[in-house]
Amino acid sequence: MAAVTGIALGMIETRGLVPAIEAADAMTKAAEVRLVGRQFVGGGYVTVLVRGETGAVNAAVRAGADACERVGDGLVAAHIIARVHSEVENILPKAPEA
């Protein structure tokens, strides 16, 4: 049986840092999610990651994608994984300790 966690993962990939910051700000204001971090993918692409309950992550990613589009054509992709497999957890950045 595959091991899964109950916390959803939301991802937004952008062209450039400004849309990424705008998306992160909108996501954390729109819903009860935790900003896990950001990854500089290369070529100017930045991915922002949030965690939380599935409904909250869904609302946050929608808000982040909308905010990102308002600052130009920075949105590359937006995606949610409702229940992340434990093997995938190993490659994700760790959330900062509170």
From Swiss-Prot:
Compartment(s): Carboxysome
Name of the gene this protein is made from: csoS1C
Biological source species: Halothiobacillus neapolitanus (strain ATCC 23641 / c2)
GO cellular component, one term: carboxysome
Phenotypic consequence of gene deletion: Required for growth in ambient air.
UniProt subunit comment: Homohexamer with a small central pore. Interacts with the N-terminus (residues 1-136) of RuBisCO (CbbL).
Biotech applications: Expression of 10 genes for alpha-carboxysome (Cb) proteins (cbbL-cbbS-csoS2-csoS3-csoS4A-csoS4B-csoS1C-csoS1A-csoS1B-csoS1D) in E.coli generates compartments that resemble Cb, contain RuBisCO and have its catalytic activity, showing it is possible to make artificial, functional Cb using these 10 genes. Cargo proteins can be targeted to these organelles. Artificial Cb assembly in E.coli requires csoS2-csoS4A-csoS4B-csoS1C-csoS1A-csoS1B-csoS1D (but not the gene for carbonic anhydrase, csoS3).
Annotated PANTHER family: BACTERIAL MICROCOMPARTMENT SHELL PROTEIN PDUJ (PTHR33941:SF11), PROPANEDIOL UTILIZATION PROTEIN PDUA (PTHR33941)
Similarity section: Belongs to the bacterial microcompartments protein family. CsoS1 subfamily.
Protein name: Carboxysome shell protein CsoS1C
This protein's UniProt keywords: Bacterial microcompartment, Carbon dioxide fixation, Carboxysome
Domain notes: The tight homohexamer forms a pore with an opening of about 2 Angstroms in diameter which is positively charged.
GO biological process: carbon fixation
Source taxon at top rank: Bacteria
SMART domains, A to Z: BMC
Residue ranges of every copy of the BMC domain listed in the record: 8-93
Function, as annotated: One of shell proteins of the carboxysome, a polyhedral inclusion where RuBisCO (ribulose bisphosphate carboxylase, ccbL-ccbS) is sequestered. Assembles into hexamers which make sheets that form the facets of the polyhedral carboxysome. The shell probably limits the diffusion of CO(2) into and out of the carboxysome. There are estimated to be 2970 CsoS1A/CsoS1C proteins per carboxysome (the proteins differ by only 1 residue).
UniProt-listed InterPro entries: Bact_microcomp_CS, BMC_dom, BMC_shell, CcmK-like_sf, CcmK/CsoS1_BMC
